[in-house]
């Protein structure tokens, strides 16, 4: 079905096609025809962060920024859906056009800039959702006009608002599309921010009667020394998990494309190798008690297996859905199932 719709979607501006695809998924959900888009995979229960995921394949943050399509997305067969990035106050993001497809490379460049309706709107949408079929992650960020010195207050405010509703919370400090945001990954800044948020997490756990896992999403552009420093901080502060990785600002593998000079984060197939290297290095340097989610460049079941082989407990797709459609979900689940059933399925590939 998606193969028939793709030529029309690709004839549209990328952001307009994005919105139309979401409306189509909603329509399929309301009319009970989601099965025409994707066959729900057989469950493959997967433990991580003290939770049991129905299957290990999730939706990465960015597709549903405001939590407006949660039930329709779960119906496609995701084991978990991550919504956001959401900020305390609504913001428009960067000027359009701000999303570009590179079909020759099965890639996307975006400079959305955390466009969202604000955390209160997201909370209202989540409260209305039925949320059947999977677990819900909520990805939080800071407003673009909040200085880094005050970033903790933005993240804390979002955490307090979404805590009762989230199955896990992701702290996004790695988007390249908010000026200065990635500076929060520097060792001392990271330690201050995550220490404060870990304290907030523990304070919130008592009144809500539950401890919601807190994950940190990192960039693929960190050098080895930065990765080692980040791993040191995240291990010291005992975060619940790490998502590796966000989009990249490098253009090495798409340098000859006419859109390569567009500012923003590159995602899709060219990111697979770079993001998987970061994932593997983090797995080698973090304790096994901190699970990893592998994201970046997954366009096939084999790509998902590569993430698992590098040490991921779960994987997420996003740009791959643009090129492959919802069938990618079941393909990834089934590939991971076959790997799990193989005699060497638990091995992590060496550095």
Curated annotation (Swiss-Prot):
InterPro entries: Aldolase_TIM, DHO_dehydrogenase, Dihydroorotate_DH_1_2, Dihydroorotate_DH_2, Dihydroorotate_DH_cat, Dihydroorotate_DH_CS
Highest taxon of source: Bacteria
Metabolic or biological pathway, per its Swiss-Prot or TrEMBL entry: Pyrimidine metabolism; UMP biosynthesis via de novo pathway; orotate from (S)-dihydroorotate (quinone route): step 1/1
Positions of the catalytic residues: 175 (nucleophile)
Positions annotated to bind substrate: 65, 110-114, 172, 177, 246-247
GO biological process: 'de novo' pyrimidine nucleobase biosynthetic process; 'de novo' UMP biosynthetic process
CDD domains per the UniProt record, alphabetical: DHOD_2_like (cd04738)
Cofactor: FMN
Alphabetical keyword list: Cell membrane, Flavoprotein, FMN, Membrane, Oxidoreductase, Pyrimidine biosynthesis
One Gene Ontology molecular-function label: dihydroorotate dehydrogenase (quinone) activity
Membrane topology: Peripheral membrane protein
SUPFAM superfamilies: FMN-linked oxidoreductases
Gene Ontology annotations for the cellular component aspect, listed alphabetically: cytoplasm; plasma membrane
Family (UniProt): Belongs to the dihydroorotate dehydrogenase family. Type 2 subfamily.
Protein name as it appears in the record: Dihydroorotate dehydrogenase (quinone)
Organism the protein comes from: Xanthomonas euvesicatoria pv. vesicatoria (strain 85-10)
